Amino acid sequence: MMVKVCGVKSLKELDAVERYADFTGVVVKSDSKRCVELDVAKELIGSSSIPVFAVSTASSYAEWEEILAKTECSFAQVHSEMPLEDFERLKAEVKVMKAFIVEGPAEKIAAKIELYSPHLILLDSGCGSGKTHDWNVSKALAERYGVFLAGGLNLDNVREAIRFVRPMGVDVSSGVERDGLKDEMLVREFVRRAKNEVR
């Protein structure tokens, strides 16, 4: 079970996360409260011992081109409905995880997954909402694709989520925060619980 802890904002948070998680993410060019400037993102990406996704709602290749150039990231996490041509250009540059909001029937989401065909698939409730979604839909999609599951995951529900949905990975942010900051004890315990639930 792979674990991604998203939304690190400082070297201190990165240190707490990279000890335990397989991946992390820095939010750039977004309205998220976890958004950092591109120079900060570059420092975090360059300092990390684990792969770091640049996470953004940027919706054009031109915007992403700036992100890639200024952060030197090798992994992108797209939270927008980019034009397909732009998305294909981005995929040619870096490894891309595309977020798909879980609302409506699984077939509707599957059609979007087939259209974009990203390197990695993230099933989410919405940008940083901290709420779970209908896991029945995610389960149906996980039976067809390798997916990362996100949205409202925490210490209390991550085992249940993994047992039910059977994703290849989980993605957490607010679920391992205390007072708005990544907490090492919460990160460690989240990862332990996730990895003890072998797929």
Curated annotation (Swiss-Prot):
Catalytic activity: N-(5-phospho-beta-D-ribosyl)anthranilate = 1-(2-carboxyphenylamino)-1-deoxy-D-ribulose 5-phosphate
UniProt GO molecular function: phosphoribosylanthranilate isomerase activity
Keywords recorded for this protein, A-Z: Amino-acid biosynthesis, Aromatic amino acid biosynthesis, Isomerase, Tryptophan biosynthesis
SUPFAM superfamilies registered for this protein in UniProt: Ribulose-phoshate binding barrel
EC number: 5.3.1.24
A Pfam short name: PRAI
Recorded metabolic or biological pathway in which this protein acts: Amino-acid biosynthesis; L-tryptophan biosynthesis; L-tryptophan from chorismate: step 3/5
Residues annotated as transmembrane: none
First-level EC class: isomerase
GO biological process: L-tryptophan biosynthetic process
Protein family per UniProt: Belongs to the TrpF family.
The protein's name in its UniProt record: N-(5'-phosphoribosyl)anthranilate isomerase
Species this chain originates from: Archaeoglobus fulgidus (strain ATCC 49558 / DSM 4304 / JCM 9628 / NBRC 100126 / VC-16)
Lineage of producing organism: Archaea, Methanobacteriati, Methanobacteriota, Archaeoglobi, Archaeoglobales
Name of the gene: trpF
